[in-house]
Amino acid sequence: RTLHGDHPLRIAFGSCRVAAPHEPPWTLPPSADRKRGKGADALYAFALRMRDTDPDTWPDLLLLLGDQIYADDTSEKVQAFIRSRRDVGRPPGLEVADFEEYTRLYWEAWGDPVLRWLLSTVPTAMIFDDHDISDDWNTSAAWVEHMRAQPWWEERITSGLASYWLYQHLGNLSPDDLDDDPVWPKVRDAGDATRVLREFAAQADQEIEGTRWSYKRDFGRTRLVVIDSRCGRVLEGSRREMIDDDEFAWVEEQATGDFDHLLMATSLPYALAPAIHHLEEWNEAVAAGAWGRAMAWVGEKVRQGIDLEHWAAFNDSFDRLAALIEAVAGGHRGRPPGSVVVLSGDVHHTYLAEFSFRGEHAGHGHSPAWQAVCSPLRNPLPRDQQAAHRRAFRRPARAVTRWLARRAGVEPDEIAWRVGEGPRVENHLGQLELDGRRAMLKVEQAVTPDGGDGAPSLEPLYEHRLSDG
């Protein structure tokens, strides 16, 4: 499908989708079946509805923001396949081990006829998150050192990146990008491209600089810049950066004004629940030695234990992206767009936050700037974890972790945000509608009939105008 110049641009987005049958007990919520209950599939419900609606209302893009597959949490069907070919008593057990097993994950994720129709009809863009490879992928230098010492890891990471390039990344590239891509012509001309992809994947894992997974897409007067927040991390000694300097410079070059809207997508939310944001700032400082060597060891254990690995845990990169958002919204990089929106997933709850700027930028006129998080498509948290996530948005928790961050020497951020919608913890799908310089966000919740038996549908959760133009 090509763009209609006289129609609004519609982008559907979400993240974190496990593959499971569309029948009980898998369609039940975790409260009804903690092990198997995944609730209604928002992406599947969206595709079912599309089949019965006017094509003029269909999205122009489906943006999938990570955890399209779960390499470390396989289904019963995939586990049966794994058992048929190797000893699961040896690591990595029932997690995927090689390229062949990755192909099973992708087949299971997208093999349903309804989803095959969706993916054949609507243009897609994707980016990985940790579970596409392994839980907490590239959290820290200590994590990488530990995993590379495992005898099965080299095959896992090589197969994971090779299959990601084939099943996800290749579709992100424009015709011009394909012409410039060093891997595509080798794959196209190789016949059997196994060796080509394995060599590329091994290099992409070992040599961060030189492999760019970030990309940009233009949709008329709207620019989308998708930022890799997993594979390109710099974790060398005292350096902790979300992406290396060359790739960040590329992001800065692409993220400009002179568009009606600038969309920046990153699988990991940039603006977290405030309490978690300050906790990650504190943890990064402590793990780097702010409270001494003994506490640095504790800080690393805490970091890996509760997944403190978002943008706030890479403070230099967080500040650099804040400066970029402010520069675009403030009109310092061309005419300010109608809106700047950061789209994210990962955290298994959905919310909308509006940015404001501090210091020398406070009070200046800016385009509206937002963080829109939509997660999960189908993988809800257990009820006890849902409560913890809600508390992280409340003032008492924020006050405690902000105090800890200041005690560890972390300076106040130049960017602030206020949560206007959420958090909500059901299975969701988000849709952006961009009409000229106007922008509207709609989030819908997936539901099934009582008992989880029957076709899922989508119900409105909230609508929020992001820009009046």
List each model region and its residues:
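Metal-dependent phosphoester/phosphodiester hydrolase catalytic core
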Residues: 1-469
